[in-house]
Amino acid sequence: MKLNELRDNPGATKNRIRVGRGIGSGKGKTAGRGVKGQKSREGVSINGFEGGQMPIYRRLPKRGFNNPTRKSFAVVNLDRIQKAIDAKKLDATAVITEKALIEAGLVRRSQDGVRLLGKGELSVKVAIEVAGASATAREGVEKAGGTLTVTGAAAEAAPAAV
């Protein structure tokens, strides 16, 4: 078999139907749109219009609000940090900072920094410095003999919860 002999399997592709190309095609004249009326015209559909019936986006109540002070963290779990240490992408002897996590490819840069979550376990002693952390993440780091430093807005806002 050669590259120029490659073909799709029979029935794998369908030819598109060209409408409005004469009565012999079966899709000529009105091109499958029916006869007259708003829907037969060009540029017809008005998004959300339901023929005069109260549209669903007006029948349902408004909910929620956009919080202007919301924090947006990139999240990383303990098990991903451990895998990166095992793969020699992170140095366990140095302090693991947000910059180190980005360079290792564990997180992308985020607006308000990195938040550490507690899924998985650490098997080595590490020092981690992040913008936020869950209680289980703190337990996991301290259980392995490491230290966790929370910097940034999360530490100032709720030191008891972090």
Curated annotation (Swiss-Prot):
Which PROSITE patterns does this one have? RIBOSOMAL_L15 (PS00475)
Where do the record's region annotations for Disordered lie?
Answer: 1-44
Q: Which GO terms describe its biological process?
A: translation
Does the keyword rRNA-binding belong to this entry? yes
**Keyword entries, A-Z:** Ribonucleoprotein, Ribosomal protein, RNA-binding, rRNA-binding
Is this entry keyworded Transport? Answer: no
- What HAMAP family does this protein map onto? Ribosomal_uL15
According to the record's subunit comment, the protein's assembly and interactions are: Part of the 50S ribosomal subunit.
Classification via NCBIfam families: rplO_bact (TIGR01071)
Name-wise, this protein is Large ribosomal subunit protein uL15
Which species is the source of this protein? Answer: Rhodospirillum rubrum (strain ATCC 11170 / ATH 1.1.1 / DSM 467 / LMG 4362 / NCIMB 8255 / S1)
The major lineage groups are: Bacteria, Pseudomonadati, Pseudomonadota, Alphaproteobacteria, Rhodospirillales
Q: Which gene encodes it?
A: rplO
